[in-house]
Amino acid sequence: AAPIIAQVAHDAGILTVAVVTKPFRFEGANRMKQAEAGIANLTDKVDSMIIIPNDRLKFVTDQKITFANAFGIADDVLKQAVSSISELVGYSENVIINLDFADVSAIMRNAGQAHMGVGSATGRDKAEQAAQAAVSSPLLETSINGATGVLINIAGSHDLGLDDVETAANIVMEA
């Protein structure tokens, strides 16, 4: 159903962004083939696609991933990705700079495969550490290198300094 819905939305001029996962290796070759066929079928029907390989989840959490919680972590990563995209144009009390839809659309329309990095940190140099984590995210099979457009969403407490924001933005832009 996703390719049909995406095609209708895309044909109507609606910005379409797909966030999809590739199955865990232990789910088998047949499941991977199905996922890759689904991704191939969806690719030309969306403006941007973020592909999250479930096997890379072990690189983004300190907790031990058990079979019982693996799918829950995958769901949480998907929720975070969709939430981050929504926050770009929506309201969040911790977001420093909100973009308007035209900004997001200009970058994501007809962009193809997209890279999304998320970083968070606390303490001294938190903005720098979060930006470094975002640009070197081990979650995706893509890299920020060669990006033709970048959207930066910086959220933080009220004590986040202008220098911190500038440092974080520079790290992303120079990556």
Language-model segments: residues:
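Tubulin/FtsZ superfamily GTPase core signature
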Residues: A1-A175
